[in-house]
Amino acid sequence: MQLLSILAIFSAYKHPQLRVFCMLIEFSVSNFRSFREKQTLSMVASPRLGKKQNVFDPEVAGEDFPKLLKVAAIYGPNASGKSNLVKAINLISDLLHKKPGDSHLIPADPFRFDRELVDKPSEFEINFIHEGTRFQFILKTTAERIFEETLFFFPKGKENLLYSRKFSPETVENYTFGSLLEGGTIVHEAWRRLTPPNSLFLAQAVLNSSEDLQQLKSPYEWLKNSNMCIGQNGITTWSIASRSMMMHSPVTKSALQDFLQHLDVPITGIRFEESEKFKSEIGPASKINDYVKLVESEAKTKLTHTTALGDAEFDFTEESGGTQNLMGFWIPWLHLHAKSSEKVVVVDELDSSIHPKIVELLVENHLVADKKSQLIFTTHDTHLMNTKLLRRDQFWLTERDANGATQVFSIHDFQGRGSEDIEKRYYEGRYRGLPILSRS
């Protein structure tokens, strides 16, 4: 990903008349890292659970589609697979951000405890809505090559194949093109020839299409750009991006200060010290990894704190982990609440070094906002279970079985009432998803 693509996020604020709807229905994964059999995270809301502000109507053309959840919180013991779920959701987007044709390995990693699965492809399935149309994308891949790539769409609720690509060691790679796929036989064949074994056909088709061929661009844009996944190390990158944006925009700097002060972080001033090396080497097309290194080494961020005794200035590196993480979460927060689009933000360990009341406020503000964006996060903070902010179907749990395989399930799968003390019942083991501890 290049710096320019990160800075482009602000372009959404310049065009409020444009509205792009991007919504996740459900995501499934199998034979990937700690996932053995198919596990599904669903954002489809269960009926009759109340809390209308927690759900929204997805507006699918020609379909009376059920409501979707605005928020999903994922709990579970350490090493139970929460972070692996975030990695799985991010894999397709990560693959689309790689330059087609590069000799890269696909970040697929099979379930290693089952010898029969080690040489088989990891499988991913994602159902989503983009610009009023429902899509289903299926990917089966090893680290070396793609074994299946299939895309369906559902005009007026009816399943239609756009294309399917399948490979097996015993046969040549086979492509099937749906009758409604635009372009024609000659164009389809050209796309096929341009697609190497380790790249997505979808990417090649879009990147090698003329302006009048837009049918595949919609699902391509959703899969590439509508999911913002933030892993445990990714928050640092977004913190760097936040600081880079402030360097270029006083309005941005003021907005971040307001965001932090709203969360009771007493920062009243932000300034930057850029070295000559930084000014000479950085450019809009710089790769984000190079940019991160330059910002960390050649651009110092100074933060002013104000108390009753006066002001004091601190370097960014002197700030607490929580303050640094909040600065990193700020861009995803803008991503969630941009006026011109709805997005899906997935955060691993949202509560990392952040006070539970701040997490509660962030979740509450997202729920009451008139938006169809979705926030999915992993956490160990059970305080949210006791706030009555979320419904039973918004709490998800992970745990590993005796074979080391991750299971994913919702608290709503267990009998209970909306008025029950979810946190208390969770610690009593009523829903599982707890660490099994032994006293030494």
Where in the sequence are the language-model features?
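Glycine-centered tight beta-turn/hairpin loop motif at sheet-sheet or coil-to-beta transitions
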Residues: 34, 130-134, 156, 308-311
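Short, surface-exposed charged micro-motifs
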Residues: 40, 125, 136-140, 291, ...
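Short polybasic amphipathic segments
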Residues: 27, 124-126, 146-153, 299-307, ...
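Electropositive, glycine-dotted interaction segments
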Residues: 136-279
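Conserved P-loop NTP-binding catalytic core
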Residues: 20, 57-73, 77, 86-146
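Switch/communication elements of ASCE P-loop NTPase nucleotide-binding domains
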Residues: 2-93, 306-439
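Extended helical coiled-coil dimerization/tether regions that scaffold
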Residues: 22, 30, 236-318, 437-440
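Coil-to-beta-strand transition motifs
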Residues: 36, 119-121, 132-134, 143-147, ...
